[in-house]
């Protein structure tokens, strides 16, 4: 993580030299914008008595905030606010800076100090998708409010971290994916891009108690084609919904935190719903789906890291700059609400996340875990707006709910996993995720379960939107059976214990049957195509070996 001391202009110039060469205007094409009917537009008036001072709202500006404008805005904030420090956590694939804004009452930015200052930390990540600018603009707006002291004394009770633009290349080109075609919000387990690795580093270093991931959803497009309607909600919200989440954490998200967000929207005259989408490729399929259950989205990855975690989506994709004030205001209200909720009882929040981390680490070798699951089907009432008249259209839709996950594969929770010595790529990714991995110094006979490969086939990943991204849609579908055995000659093997707070993240990475796993994505070596059967270089440890002397 490169420290960027904004108070020293020469160092700032050096740190942002590559970014400063980018053009002043983002490549937004107004000709591709969907124009709403007057009846639809009437549902989304400009918020009253709200001042919008971020770069996209400059008089006469027709596009969105450029990289250069964002950096200049941040620089001016940092120069005027002792509470704000800024670090550049990475350079994008095309060389643009990814800044992290760190707000503390005392003006410190050290992860070690923040971990000891007795306050919970809220992380806001915006614009993982480059063509979803409202989240990034609201992040700047909320940062400005914090910098100017307009959020009261919240910094006496919480720390706030903001990544206002996680995908600066996508923002510059006004495209959803990263420069290499990867969907950043499906890359938080595999870490195939510098952008996802940067976010992982922030998560590892600062251990946020609360994480908010800010996006925008498609307004027209497939909604018009399928329903002759457009989306009518201001904001769609969903907490983490993935396999093996801590029950107390899940209950807190589904209860008080969900309620706080919804009440904040209603208090400002904004319409909200649980998040849902529909397949953009199979237009004959009118099923509506909540956000997925995979561990690769930031919302779910943060949950597996024992953080209160929410996805926020506001209307925006495809409508250009229409209703931009209202879209940004909706995002701002959510960001403010999350910080206020954290500040309302900071000690209780810290106790919750501390207890969850301890509970997860203490679960090694106990009970069952869900290896593979799927959302359950049902019905759900939603309201869209007639695309021509704007009249509300309320109906009961076929629904795929991530709030109830149906188990497809369950297994006993092991004490940990062993990886063969040559599986360095998997070890490196686990460590980049913040996982503790140890190398065995001595050979011992270790009771294990071996993964025998029953079948291998190439397939396409499932995504509730129809595709993962421009790339990253393919995977190897693996089925295995477990064979109890004893592994000998283990000196040099890698041991990944589940007696650590990231245990459920480890399970998501190493159990082979899901589309996000290291096995399905080729990080862990598969048997060659010529082998009719084989085993994986990965074993489940069935007894506690952490207490064996001189093993590590």
What name fits each language-model region?
Residues 12-20:
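Bacterial N-terminal signal peptides
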Residues 2-8, 26-552:
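Structured catalytic-domain cores with a bias toward divalent-metal coordination
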């Amino acid at each position: 993580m490169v420290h960027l001391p904004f108070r020293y202009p020469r160092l700032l110039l050096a740190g942002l030299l590559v970014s400063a060469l980018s053009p002043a205007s983002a490549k937004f094409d107004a000709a591709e914008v969907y124009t709403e009917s007057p009846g639809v537009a009437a549902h989304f008036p400009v918020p009253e008595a709200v001042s919008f001072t971020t770069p996209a709202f400059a008089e006469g500006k027709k596009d969105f905030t450029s990289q250069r404008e964002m950096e200049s805005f941040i620089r001016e904030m940092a120069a005027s606010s002792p509470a704000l420090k800024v670090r550049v956590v990475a350079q994008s694939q095309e060389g643009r800076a990814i800044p992290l804004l760190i707000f503390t009452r005392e003006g410190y930015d050290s992860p070690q100090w923040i971990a000891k200052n007795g306050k919970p930390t809220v992380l806001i990540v915006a614009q993982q998708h480059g063509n979803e600018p409202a989240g990034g603009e609201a992040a700047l707006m909320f940062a400005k409010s914090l910098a100017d002291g307009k959020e009261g004394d919240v910094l006496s009770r919480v720390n706030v971290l903001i990544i206002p633009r996680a995908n600066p290349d996508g923002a510059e080109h006004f495209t959803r994916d990263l420069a290499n075609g990867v969907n950043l919000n499906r890359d938080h387990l595999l870490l195939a891009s510098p952008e996802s690795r940067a976010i992982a580093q922030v998560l590892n270093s600062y251990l946020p108690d609360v994480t908010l991931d800010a996006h925008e959803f498609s307004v027209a497009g497939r909604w018009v084609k399928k329903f002759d309607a457009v989306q009518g909600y201001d904001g769609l919200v969903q907490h983490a919904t993935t396999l093996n989440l801590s029950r107390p954490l899940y209950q807190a998200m589904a209860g008080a935190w969900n309620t706080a967000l919804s009440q904040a929207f209603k208090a400002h005259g904004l319409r909200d719903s649980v998040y849902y989408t529909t397949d953009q490729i199979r237009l004959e399929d009118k099923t509506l789906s909540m956000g997925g259950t995979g561990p690769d989205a930031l919302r779910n990855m943060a949950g597996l890291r024992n953080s209160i975690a929410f996805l926020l989506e506001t209307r925006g994709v495809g409508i250009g700059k229409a209703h931009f004030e209202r879209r940004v205001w909706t995002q701002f209200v959510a960001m403010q609400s999350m910080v206020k909720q954290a500040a309302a009882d900071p000690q209780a929040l810290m106790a919750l996340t501390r207890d969850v981390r301890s509970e997860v680490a203490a679960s090694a070798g106990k009970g069952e875990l869900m290896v593979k699951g799927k959302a359950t089907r049902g019905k759900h009432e939603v309201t869209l707006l007639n695309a021509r008249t704007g009249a509300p259209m309320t109906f009961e839709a076929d629904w795929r709910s991530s709030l109830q996950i149906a188990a497809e594969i369950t297994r006993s929770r092991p004490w940990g996993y062993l990886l063969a010595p040559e599986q360095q790529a998997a070890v490196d990714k686990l460590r980049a995720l913040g996982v503790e991995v140890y190398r065995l110094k001595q050979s011992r006979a270790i009771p294990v379960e071996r993964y025998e490969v029953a079948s291998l086939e190439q397939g396409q990943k499932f995504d509730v939107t129809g595709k993962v991204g421009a790339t990253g849609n393919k995977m190897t579908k693996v089925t295995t059976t477990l064979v109890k055995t004893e592994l000998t000659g283990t000196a040099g093997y890698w041991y990944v214990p589940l007696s650590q707070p990231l245990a459920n993240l480890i399970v998501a990475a190493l159990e082979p049957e899901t589309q996000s796993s290291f096995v399905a994505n080729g990080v862990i070596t598969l048997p060659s195509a010529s082998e009719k059967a084989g085993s994986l270089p990965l074993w489940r440890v069935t007894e506690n070996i952490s207490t064996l002397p001189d093993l590590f």
